[in-house]
Amino acid sequence: RMSLVVDIEKKLGSFTLRSQFETDSGTMALLGASGCGKSVTLKCIAGIMTPDRGRIVLNGRVLFDSEKRTDLTPQQRRVGYLFQQYALFPNMTVEQNILCGIREGSRSEKRALAAEKLRMFRLEGLEKKHPAQLSGGQQQRVALARILCSEPQAILLDEPFSALDSYLKWNLELELSDLLAGFHGPILWVSH
């Protein structure tokens, strides 16, 4: 059964963040004012930050447990993280960025998977372009294609549309929902 169980505490300046929830496959949103700890929660799940105490379990596998001193590296967690600014490598082409997400397989298998993701995310013809030459929506699709190439068990979306105007934001939210419709694990979406 696909599930994500989070029960953590993290001291943040003058307050202690307490994040406790459980979700199965499907989309769940974390909503709240800026600075309340939504992004910190995602970073703790991804292994980018370490909670002070608690436990994080993904699909029955313990990612973090303060009592048992378990703290898997980000690479071991199999969690896809879409940053606010997409975190594409500016010196690499679209194709190279997507290839970075593929861990296993021969060179030809990796190229075939990258080509499949280019088609799936409607990025054909942009393979040799660099991120700076792409629109925000195209950059987001490249980042998502790269994430899905790594076969994550959960996807974390950290305010993916925070910098966009409301009309563009609405269109990209619809597009993102379509692109993630085939993903069968938990999807955690942070917004404010």
Enumerate the predicted regions with their spans.
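Hydrophobic anchor residue at the start of the ABC signature
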Residues: 144
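Short coil-to-helix segment of the ABC ATPase nucleotide-binding domain corresponding to the Q-loop/switch region
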Residues: 91-101
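A short, proline-enriched helix->beta-strand linker immediately N-terminal to the Walker B motif
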Residues: 149-153
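Catalytic Walker B motif of ABC-type/P-loop ATPase nucleotide-binding domains
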Residues: 155-159
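Conserved ABC ATPase signature
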Residues: 130-134, 138
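Conserved ABC ATPase "signature" region
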Residues: 61-66, 109-126, 177-178
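ABC ATPase NBD coupling module
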Residues: 63-80, 104-112
